[in-house]
Amino acid sequence: MNKKNKKLFLEALEKKFKGESPEEKKTTFYCFGGWKQSERKREFVEYAKKLAKKRGIPFYNPDIGVPLGQRKLMAYRISGTDAYVEGDDLHFVNNAAIQQMVDDIKRTVIVGMDTAHAVLEKRLGVEVTPETINEYMETINHALPGGAVVQEHMVEVHPGLVDDCYAKIFTGNDELADELDKRVLIDINKEFPEEQAEMLKKYIGNRTYQVNRVPTIVVRCCDGGTVSRWSAMQIGMSFISAYKLCAGEAAIADFSFAAKHADVIEMGTILPARRARGPNEPGGIPFGVFADIIQTSRVSDDPARISLEVIGAAATLYDQVWLGSYMSGGVGFTQYASATYTDDILDDFVYYGAEYVEDKYGFCGVKPSMEVVKDIATEVTLYGLEQYEEYPTLLEDHFGGSQRAAVVAAAAGCSTAFATGNSNAGINAWYLSQILHKEGHSRLGFYGYDLQDQCGASNSLSIRSDEGLVHELRGPNYPNYAMNVGHQPEYAGIAQAPHAARGDAFVVNPLIKVAFADNDLSFDFRWPRKEIARGALREFMPDGERTLIIPASK
């Protein structure tokens, strides 16, 4: 890595604060042009004036409320890229790539095919061969986007609206994979490095799974809970058609049960009534599952880079979309979340910790213990706090205490997980970092930010009945994790970190890891931060657009 002597964030700070040295202790205010210094806000005002006149209703006006632009309205460098973007373009409503990433997760369901094949062979006496599987896959790729296969006089969906919808298949059996239609095969041997491919095939075995991508427009109109139902209905119709079955016979009920329940793997679990969301919604996605969705680990062997990509993507899902909109509703959470994936600040802290660990312990080179947790968490936390003290522009970049606390603790947690190969040790280091940080600065963030951090030490190195679970299986709905921004994305990175250090093929679920090794997805899950940048630069083309069915101009 060899990044110890180079502050990764300095280049971004020098460009953001032109004319000011990052070390300068004094600065100026009210001389930057207010909101007009921002190209994007000037565009907002221009649009808003026209629309206010057209609507006859007051609209966006940046002169209302606190004066904007007292200091520089900073551009942000997307970490790990050369792209500088305006902060407004990182709000998920303004960023098509973030929207598509969330949609791609919500619209995905994995369904095992072995139960259905057993019903065909044992109950109905129908032979299942690679040829019949290929015919079924062709049928489901007609039916899943909204094509009719069993009944006449059924309305169908325009293919141009759902060109993002398809089904693919994968298996751990190389002989079967060789005979399957390559157009719809996720080839584990091709998509993963050899050692990872062997690990995945060992866990998957001879079983066969299909990955269904329901149309983006469906999860836009409905929700993630719709996905398994949409999928199951078309699976049933496709089996009936491909294997020439009678739609009314009793065995069809077994297909329905398998497709809707028994063989279904969803991305997220259903949430309790007070959070009131169905399966496949962001609040039900465990941290380890999200880490498996991100694909950097199959194209990079750098544990720090892998963990940072997970954190960056998770920041948009958990903090911006889930907590910032589903649970809170507003615009402010983007500012918290983007601290983890902009200006190479977290990158600098994580690489510092990774190098410290590699030199002293080696990756996965020491058993987890409180002594190890204390050593690494203290070293990385103090390093991070020293940077904020040495570079005032860094402090201004992360102007909120909760931003600083999240970034420093994330580096401490990931670094400890790199050393121990243990995510629970990593999350314990996160909590120790928060305590050290509060001791040094007297506060962390907004009132309630550190609620979970004050009680986290007791439930991260022990498994208790009401606060159990290894860290990879925890998620946004875990006790105490439900409503504090600046935690969940970093927790996902800490779930990934030990597995990245060990070179594991997956974190929690090999099926989910394989399902997203799919080059036909519009969002590139290998490099999510690059995709977020493309969205901010308006270079990303999303799926699910309605151009075909609306007037040329509204």
Swiss-Prot record:
Keywords, A to Z, come to:
Metal-binding, Methanogenesis, Methylation, Nickel, Transferase
- Superkingdom per UniProt: Archaea
Q: What is its EC number?
A: 2.8.4.1
Which terms does the UniProt entry file under GO BP? methanogenesis
Q: Which Pfam families match?
A: MCR_alpha (PF02249), MCR_alpha_N (PF02745)
Binding locations of coenzyme M: Y336, Y447
* Cofactor(s) needed by this chain: coenzyme F430
- Which top-level enzyme class is recorded in the Swiss-Prot or TrEMBL entry? transferase
Q: Name one GO molecular function term.
A: coenzyme-B sulfoethylthiotransferase activity
Q: Where does coenzyme B bind?
A: R229, K260, H261, R274
Q: Which residues bind coenzyme F430?
A: Q151
Pathway(s) per entry: One-carbon metabolism; methyl-coenzyme M reduction; methane from methyl-coenzyme M: step 1/1
Q: Tell me what reaction this enzyme catalyses.
A: coenzyme B + methyl-coenzyme M = methane + coenzyme M-coenzyme B heterodisulfide
Provide the protein name.
Answer: Methyl-coenzyme M reductase II subunit alpha
Does the keyword section mention rRNA processing? no
Give the UniProt family note. Belongs to the methyl-coenzyme M reductase alpha subunit family.
